[in-house]
Amino acid sequence: MRKPRSTLMKTAGMAFAAALGLLGSIVGPSAGVAEAAPTGIRVSDGRVVEANGNEFVMRGINHAYTWYPEQTTAMADIAAKGANTVRVVLGSGDRWTRTSASQVSGLIDQCKANKVICVLEVHDTTGYGEDGAATTLDKAADYWISVKSALEGQEDYVVVNIGNEPYGNTNASAWTGATKSAIGKLRNAGLDHALMVDAPNWGQDWSGTMRANAASVFASDPDRNTIFSIHMYGVYDTAAEVQDYLNHFVNNELPIVVGEFGDAHSDGNPDEDAIMATAQSLGVGYIGWSWSGNGSGVEYLDMVNGFDANSLTGWGNRFINGANGIVATSETASVYGDGGGDTGGGTAPNGYPYCVDGSASDPDGDGWGWESSRSCVVPGGSADTGGDTGGGTAPNGYPYCVDGSASDPDGDGWGWENSRSCVVAGSGADS
């Protein structure tokens, strides 16, 4: 799991990552051009959305199922705290006990019963290349194909996280080819779910490998339905590092989730406040590590003591009840039928999301607010209508520009708002 590194390695690695990130932003292809077929959870313009097009921002907790299968109430307990996602640790049988297809089906049923999205991950790949007991992404793909019967038809509820932290700090550059190959193998086998891929370097990508190659990995997926996951521990001990990494993905329309993080770690002191605040401001998902059951000196990462939902640790209380935490920011997936409505969540008739904080997000009283780095509609306000002027969708499928021609300095009918292209109503592009 979170492997310690030297300070020198961190400094050199982050400098290299910054250089690679700059190169990628110059020459990398735009990943937001192609979109997945409208089935299940998918990627659209660099955002994670549900089948109905509603954006879904993960606010979840990791659960170590494969080591604690007897903790049968954990899923319900996590959901009761307000999480909308549970990332579930599975075993492929290569290192840890294999999670069978029937067990996978049971876990998905639990997710659905508790109205959370299931991110299912194979943990046996952790630290491959540096940890001799770890297995390959190719073997992880074989596992997913072997439990295909449990996954089919569950695309609305399940994200397949191919392999946890699939490379350590040895030969991390091989991550790109191995990840592309695993994605292709799963697509060729008929798995059309949203896929999630973890970064190398024990998930922390201090080498910048995922950052530099994410666009090409995304483009290699014929479904264009791959979500990137960064794990933020000691490498991300300043707000600047957190913001730089997440902003790179958002600005390049590459879907990113913080798949693991904590408030402390043996390799440094992660800035959990910056992680949560930045994720909230960008509309990026996060999944904290972990509910309970940690050992080997990292017991401080438990959110509850001994799987007791009524015994929150300091980390658990901060993550669940603190600023930008689960209680304040989590919204249930709309596939469950109660994740929206018209009071603080859901989608307005003009296609824009409702403001979670209502009129508090609208200081000038025009009916439009600003949350998660995008415009939102105040329920019941003057903007809470349909039409094609200042919201809604143009005939070509792109949203209309809220600010009209003000968003179109070159006068070609196309504007740029909320990190995506928009159409100026009545312009030459409005067709």
What are the residue ranges of the model-derived segments?
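Secretory targeting and sorting signals
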Residues: 2-34
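N-terminal presequences and immediately downstream first alpha-helices
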Residues: 11-17, 34-52, 58, 172-184, ...
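Extracellular glycoside hydrolase catalytic/binding regions
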Residues: 40-41, 68-72, 137-145, 149-159, ...
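Extracellular/cell-surface secretome signature
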Residues: 345-431
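Aromatic-lined substrate-binding rim segments of carbohydrate-active enzymes
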Residues: 71-129, 137-142, 180, 184-190, ...
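Solvent-exposed, acidic/flexible segments
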Residues: 67, 97-101, 133, 137-140, ...
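N-terminal carbohydrate-binding accessory modules
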Residues: 32-85, 325, 331, 335, ...
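A recurrent domain-boundary module in secreted/ectodomain proteins
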Residues: 310-341, 374-384, 422-428
